[in-house]
Amino acid sequence: MTSAPRRSPSRLPLAILWLTLLLAALLRFFRIGYQSLWADEGNSVAMAGRTLAEISTAAAADIHPPLYYWLLNLWVRVFGDSETALRALSALWGIVLVWLVYQIAVRLVDRRTALIATFFAAISPFLIYYSQEARMYEMLAALAGVLYYGLVRFILHENIVLPADGTGKTVSFSGLATGVIVVASIAGLYTHYTFLAIVGLVTLVYLLWVANSRRRGFVKIRLLHWGLLLIVIAFFYLPWAGTAISQLTSWPRTGTVVPLNEAISHILNLLALGPVSQLEPGSPWLSIFLLLFILGLWPWIRANGRRAHWLSWLLPLLAILVPVVMVLAGGLYKESYLKFLVVAAAPFCILLGRGVTGFMEALEKAAWKKRSAAPAVQSGRRRGAPTRGQPAKAARPAAAQPAAAPPVRDPVGRWLALIWLLIAVVLVSIPTVQTLAAYYFDPAVARDNYRGMAAYITAVGRPDDAIILNAPGQREVFEYYYDGPLPVYGLPEQRPPDAEATVAQLAEIARQHPHLYGLLWATDESDPQHIVEGWLDTHAYKATDTWQGNVRFVTYATQQDSDAWPRQEADIALDDQVSLTTYALSSREVESGDVLQLQLAWQAEQVPETDYTVFVQLLDQRNQVVAQHDAPPLSGERPTSGWQPGEIVLDNRGILIPPGTAPGDYRLIAGMYDPATGERLATEYADYIDLGSVRVNRPAVPPPPEALNMQNAERFSFDEITLLGNDRYKRGFRHEPDEPLRAGDLLHLTFFWRADVNPTAAWWFTARLVQGADTELAAVSGPLVSDLYPTLNWEQGEIVRGEHDLQIPDYVKPGRYQLQLFLHTGNPTDTIDRVILGRVTVSE
């Protein structure tokens, strides 16, 4: 351990520190309000809107103490409750934590280690993620850092004032360090219940220090002082202790049991790159972090000839192990509980920094020894002369000793150390930058998109529709974004759920509302019997089912008089395993944006070989898929492998006709396929069953742009027509738009058009894939929608979507290519404009 120098001999370290803190601030505030709040952040919003007394009452019934909510209450009074304002409090705690990493590491090890560890903390995806969340976890990590800082200062002060030989009449204690420990402990305990383990950890470390330094005396008074310190902490926590005991003993443990090596690998991934890491276990990039971690624990011999003090590696190691053991042994190993490990992220960065500088010193020392072949007097130190930090021994008379040369700093060792430093920082930074890029820009790893779901419901919801929140704990965050007129039902209302009461409520809701929008979140805890979704899947007609982060967003139609629908005979077998006996449609006509309801009556000819998926598709005259619904029978409630020969299963389906679908006649088909292989079951003539035609009509009111759910919402105006946006993905992978596109594949293009006037021409488009300046690799041309619905038939304000395929030739090499779009009246050379839609990646 070292004392932090009062004045730096150079301004460079201070400049590096301030630049690192600036980097930390930029990374924590960059796009901080871009992602939607998620459910737990909604709870924070609701708590912050209460009075301080109401917060205390509500927190007593929750698993989180009230301090963070109290601070957030005061914070929003000043800065408001926007996403940015709500999360800014955590961002500031995150910056404080980065500064604390420096203050701790500079005292535990040295300035060089502290600067490197601070840089690692500044760019840590784990710490950045929770710095951009309106929850208490970054504050928890920062308070743990404050406590570690107070402990280190406390021990350093004792190390200075304690006599080396145990003599002396009295010993003093650092008042500042004592105050820091007490305040940080009390604040931490009122922030999160796991902080009790942190207080126990620092107590253990202090006891180890006392045992190690017992020969320096004053053991009893030191233990008494620490005991009084703990009594003060307990006294101020006593008003909340009963609540804490009640919550900790009654809260359910819902962790999962996994092999220890798998858990450790996942935790390493989390500490290194946070919850959005895309690396697989065993990745070479994770090996870099593991290597630096091990090097950080190595007992390096310092430049002064001594081994590093045990506290410099034991404190950060225990600060990692204690929360990890708490999670693994306490039944808390679950994705939603691993955020408790954020308290270990800063100590992890300190050990990474120690691993870098420890090996740097080893390289410097090894190079110095290799070049030092001359007698000791020529190496800058006489044999037996004291090294820095060691007490001097009795020396011979000066006249009998040769003059000592000044110390020599070997340039080879310095260059080797700098090269190692550069390599280590780059190897840590590469996966870190990739992870941060995904976190900031990739919707696939974004938080639960309540903002988007609320906007969609606002755009498409009709006056008689309703919203179901399964679980009710989502209400706060959903109503943060949604202030529309539709009723919101939180189900199940009871905990544990009352199945009979919940089913009765669902039946009444379905009777009153023709369309339901469902937000399904944490259902294993709120609805472990799946009462809500199970009833809806068997009694309503599910139209969509998509993931919005960790929330499933579903839509249902609730037509109840299916017995009155015309029932069509089919009696068509699929590979002699399953037959479609009959089917019924709610109507042969439907408006775009509405749900076509379909009931399929399946009969098992034998026990099916596997669990098949049912598909229903609406096709245009070019066999382009306009609408589609793929799901197991009854959305998984009745898997086919459980069917018995002769059994008839009624399978309700809802097919959402996408807003903007052009008016016209479409073909409806259905069938089954093996989800493992994609292979369809076949009839005698085809691999699908033809269910006849469906007429799609123009809606009375054009859909708002929010209802289109466009992948790329960039607008371009072309005289009479505006392109509102477009979707691009490998054909057949609308549900996975990031599926790699390769040479020979079809790139599916969906264009969303709006007629700004009644068009006076039959407009066509040409889409080109271009390499370099203007080398065309592929192109597709045609009417904006189809020959059957030319733009001359469009009305002013009408929004229409066109579905097209662009063939990627086999000879196209992997790379990124420009996608261009032209509008013309049938002659591609007579264009009115050209726009660049972006770039398309062709993978290997």
Give names to the regions the model predicted:
Residues 160-162, 374, 378, 407:
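Ser/Thr/Pro/Gly-rich low-complexity, intrinsically disordered segments
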Residues 9-163, 172-365, 417-569:
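Terminal, non-globular segments
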Residues 165-171, 373-375, 384-386, 390, ...:
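Short, low-complexity intrinsically disordered segments enriched in A/P/G/S/L with frequent Arg
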Residues 1-9:
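Short, Lys/Arg-rich, polar N-terminal cytosolic tail immediately upstream
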